[in-house]
Amino acid sequence: MTKGILGKKVGMTQIFTESGEFIPVTVIEATPNVVLQVKTVETDGYEAVQVGFDDKREVLSNKPAKGHVAKANTAPKRFIREFKNIEGLEVGAELSVEQFEAGDVVDVTGTSKGKGFQGVIKRHGQSRGPMAHGSRYHRRPGSMGPVAPNRVFKNKRLAGRMGGNRVTVQNLEIVQVILEKNVILVKGNVPGAKKSLITIKSAVKAAK
């Protein structure tokens, strides 16, 4: 069965094991998620569990949103997402960090930091041209393609807005779970800025 929870990225820190090993970790605060809807094949065409995270003021919610969360007897939520392959939950139930433990391998999804308009070297990792005075290009994209089509092909790697994309980092290890603070420490870094939404769920490609 899949484990899953929504949380917020707090930042990065470091911890030391009993043997003195230094481990960089990302701190993710995951307050209890509330199950807002249980979708089935008969009613929705597929099976999933819809959960809500992070309360927001009722003034900022419309009537349909208030009616939807009222079935779970909870406040309106800022973030609503779905998890598949989760069984045994009813509307109004809570998902907490208790389901995870140290050593679990998870996939973490977030929205990468926006970098603004960037060139091909930073955006796509292309090599720069010669930097001597005789060179006609230094950080330009280079060839646009052959002469014959007389146009630039679609999907040509060019300069543009970088970041702000949905990114998933797979097979990260949970180092520690702090129940009293609803905090999960994940080994390494995860995508996203501080206070951004993070999705944690059981790894799809974890070694069995």
UniProtKB/Swiss-Prot annotation:
The entry's keywords: Ribonucleoprotein, Ribosomal protein, RNA-binding, rRNA-binding
Molecular function as annotated in GO: rRNA binding; structural constituent of ribosome
SUPFAM superfamilies: Translation proteins
PROSITE patterns, sorted: RIBOSOMAL_L3
GO CC field: cytosolic large ribosomal subunit
Gene Ontology terms describing biological process: translation
Region described as Disordered: 116-148
Top-level division of the source organism's lineage: Bacteria
Cysteines paired by S-S bonds: none
Role summary: One of the primary rRNA binding proteins, it binds directly near the 3'-end of the 23S rRNA, where it nucleates assembly of the 50S subunit.
Record-linked PANTHER family: 50S RIBOSOMAL PROTEIN L3 (PTHR11229), LARGE RIBOSOMAL SUBUNIT PROTEIN UL3C (PTHR11229:SF16)
Family: Belongs to the universal ribosomal protein uL3 family.
Quaternary structure note: Part of the 50S ribosomal subunit. Forms a cluster with proteins L14 and L19.
Protein's name according to its UniProt entry: Large ribosomal subunit protein uL3
Organism this protein belongs to: Streptococcus pyogenes serotype M6 (strain ATCC BAA-946 / MGAS10394)
